[in-house]
């Protein structure tokens, strides 16, 4: 039975779950840690389905938790990548303004970034930013040298490897679905486990996991899918690194951007469209429970009423 007893159990095998487990294992090397992931491989959802960008912390409110986590997290991630020979590139990005109104917002972004400890930010004229991205067009651009690219699935798998190298008694279990839990007991399709502490890092199902503990939880995850286009090989030369638009301050999205992936591909995206299945990645994916729960939530209705025109354009 001792093999089924753990000090910490992490539910969720994305980068948040593995980073949490790794930090705990490094700080407390003698503790036994268990990571449970329902898929056959780690990092198969949000972690492995994004632009792969090392974000600088440019946009977030100064001194906020989000800003501090982004800046410190990026620095730690780059150091981890260097120490563990993970392919990455701190290549910088440009945020391009296409009119004078956006130029004013660009200056505000620069000030905001500097308050978040970003150095080397520069407002560039057209000639200057086209020396970085020759095919970009606009009035001016903000150069952000701290931005970069990485493969987060690779990072996640590296974290998993390092956890078990620190403590051979720790385990990373895939194809392991949580069926039920109470107090310190976890029931899964791969057996039952006892854990002194349980940490949920359940991604798109975090609210459902939390609601079983916090009955009065008034928050809910509403799923949005992002679609990407991949540039043809003949067009790859048109994007050197990262090209972003000036974001619309009314919405929590950075806008459709061009990204050089760490494998050399160039992607354009994402948009943001309501999805009828939480972990649905195709336009036709549908789950009745997910859909009804999202549409019955007052926050979803408010979002749709206030932003229906923007939403239609995303399709």
Task: Name every feature range the model reports, one short phrase each.
Residues 16, 41, 205:
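Conserved Rossmann-like nucleotide-cofactor binding loop
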Residues 43-73, 83-88, 128, 275-313:
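Glycine-rich active-site loop/strand segments that organize a redox cofactor
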Residues 21, 25, 162:
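Gly/Ala-rich phosphate-binding loop of Rossmann-like dinucleotide-binding domains
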Residues 25-48:
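Glycine-rich FAD pyrophosphate-binding loop
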Residues 19, 181, 188-286:
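Flavin-dependent oxidoreductases
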Residues 142-197, 201-208:
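Helical element adjacent to the flavin cofactor pocket in flavoenzyme catalytic cores
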Residues 2-16, 34:
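Beta1/beta-strand and adjacent pyrophosphate-binding region of the FAD-binding site
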């Amino acid at each position: 039975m001792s093999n089924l007893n753990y000090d910490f159990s992490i539910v969720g095998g994305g980068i948040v779950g593995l980073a949490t487990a790794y930090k705990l294992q490094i700080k407390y090397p003698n503790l036994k840690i268990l990571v449970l992931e329902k898929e056959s491989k780690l990092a198969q959802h949000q972690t492995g389905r994004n632009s792969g960008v090392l974000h600088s912390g440019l946009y977030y409110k100064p001194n906020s938790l989000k800003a501090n986590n982004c800046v410190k997290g990026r620095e730690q991630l780059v150091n981890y990548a260097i120490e563990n020979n993970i392919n990455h590139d701190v290549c910088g990005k440009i945020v391009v303004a296409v009119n004078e109104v956006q130029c004013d917002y660009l200056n505000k972004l620069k000030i905001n970034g500097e308050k978040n400890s970003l150095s080397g930010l520069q407002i560039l004229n057209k000639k200057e930013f086209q020396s970085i991205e020759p095919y970009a067009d606009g009035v001016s651009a903000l150069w952000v040298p701290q931005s970069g690219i990485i493969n987060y699935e690779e990072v996640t798998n590296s974290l998993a490897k390092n956890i078990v190298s620190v403590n051979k008694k720790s385990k990373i279990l895939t194809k392991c679905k949580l069926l039920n839990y109470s107090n310190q007991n976890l029931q899964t399709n791969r057996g039952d486990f006892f854990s002194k502490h349980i940490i949920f890092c359940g991604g798109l199902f975090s609210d459902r996991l939390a609601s079983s503990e916090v009955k009065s939880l008034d928050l809910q995850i509403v799923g949005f899918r992002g679609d990407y286009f991949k540039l043809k090989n003949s067009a790859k030369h048109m994007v050197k690194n990262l090209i972003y638009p000036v974001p619309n301050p009314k919405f929590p999205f950075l806008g459709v951007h061009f990204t050089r992936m760490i494998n050399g591909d160039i992607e354009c995206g994402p948009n943001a469209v309501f999805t009828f299945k939480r972990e649905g990645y195709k336009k036709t994916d549908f789950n009745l429970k997910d859909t009804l729960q999202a549409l019955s939530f007052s926050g979803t209705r408010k979002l749709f009423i206030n932003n229906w025109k923007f939403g239609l354009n995303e399709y």
